[in-house]
């Protein structure tokens, strides 16, 4: 269950604990996310045996039998297969409930956390958590305005959060470690999704402009090198240091042409969701 050595982005209930997938319906998208604290519970008489401690599931409100599980930090509901905390998190940690009902654990100073479920992959923006006594029900965290943009990598297709709100900038994908040029997504007619014909000319202006600039600089340097080679042949026979100027001109021109090829072949990343 929850421990200090567990990855903060992994769910507290591992897939190996059961082959049944969560059946609780996902929450609707909420403006404020709730920082999970263990709810207060009391030992309630069970219909089968008296004195057996139980607790209500935080997702479906079903009763969870705590017999033999009081040493754990979280317990798994047998109805919706979601986790419910029964103890305070480890020192320096806090619980966070994703809108898809996945219970996560992260550092108490964390501002963002990603949901590891393949069908969710939300980037959760966290606010400062209010100190709440254990005898009171959990309260929602202070609202924090999300920042940044979720973009789709043009190389691997994965989504990542990019904090630069301006377009025409280079974004490095944390998954494949490749560079993308971030461009705005433009809708087609009648609100349809953009195709190749609707790619933003404003967004692609940065790589095109830099590609043309490097081509121009490369050709100028090569022409200068050719001019030096033709015009200073006799002078170079007496002063061999002239060959260095030839090599520098050709080398700079070659580097500029290589950079032009890089900017001409760079791929674009389109925003998935933008936050003001």
Swiss-Prot record:
Keyword Transmembrane helix: yes
Gene Ontology molecular function, alphabetical: phosphatidylinositol-4,5-bisphosphate 4-phosphatase activity
Pfam families: Tmemb_55A (PF09788)
UniProt keywords, alphabetically: Endosome, Hydrolase, Lipid metabolism, Lysosome, Membrane, Transmembrane, Transmembrane helix
Any one annotated GO CC term: lysosomal membrane
Transmembrane spans: 211-231, 246-266
Keyword Cell cycle: no
Main location: membrane
Residues annotated as the enzyme's active site: 106
Enzyme class: hydrolase
EC number(s) reported in the record: 3.1.3.78
Compositional bias ranges of the Basic and acidic residues kind: 1-10
Residue numbers covered by motif CX5R motif: 106-112
Ranges of compositional bias, category Polar residues: 13-27
Function: Catalyzes the hydrolysis of phosphatidylinositol-4,5-bisphosphate (PtdIns-4,5-P2) to phosphatidylinositol-4-phosphate (PtdIns-4-P).
Protein name (database record): Type 2 phosphatidylinositol 4,5-bisphosphate 4-phosphatase
Protein source organism: Xenopus tropicalis (Western clawed frog)
């Amino acid at each position: 269950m929850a421990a200090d050595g567990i990855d903060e982005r992994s769910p507290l209930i591992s897939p190996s604990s059961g082959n049944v997938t969560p059946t609780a319906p996902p929450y609707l998208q909420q403006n404020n996310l709730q920082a999970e604290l263990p709810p207060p519970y009391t030992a309630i008489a069970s219909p089968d045996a008296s004195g057996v401690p139980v607790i209500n599931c935080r997702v479906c409100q079903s009763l969870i039998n705590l017999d033999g599980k009081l040493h754990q930090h979280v317990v798994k509901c047998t109805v919706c297969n979601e986790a419910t905390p029964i103890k305070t998190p480890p020192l320096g940690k806090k619980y966070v409930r994703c809108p898809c009902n996945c219970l996560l654990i992260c550092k108490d100073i964390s501002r963002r956390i990603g949901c590891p479920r393949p069908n969710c992959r939300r980037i959760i923006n966290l606010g400062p958590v209010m100190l709440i006594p254990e005898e009171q029900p959990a309260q929602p965290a202070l609202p924090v305005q999300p920042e940044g943009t979720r973009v789709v990598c043009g190389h691997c297709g994965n989504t990542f959060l990019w904090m630069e709100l301006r377009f025409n900038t280079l974004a490095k994908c944390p998954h494949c470690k490749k560079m993308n040029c971030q461009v705005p997504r433009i809708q087609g007619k009648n609100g349809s999704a953009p195709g190749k014909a609707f790619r933003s000319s404003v967004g692609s202006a940065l790589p095109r402009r830099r590609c043309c600039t490097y081509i121009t600089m490369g050709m100028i340097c090569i022409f200068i090198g050719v001019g030096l080679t033709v015009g200073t042949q006799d002078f170079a026979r007496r002063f061999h240091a002239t060959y260095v100027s030839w090599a520098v001109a050709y080398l700079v021109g070659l580097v500029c042409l290589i950079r032009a090829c890089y900017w001409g072949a760079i791929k674009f990343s389109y925003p998935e969701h933008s936050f003001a």
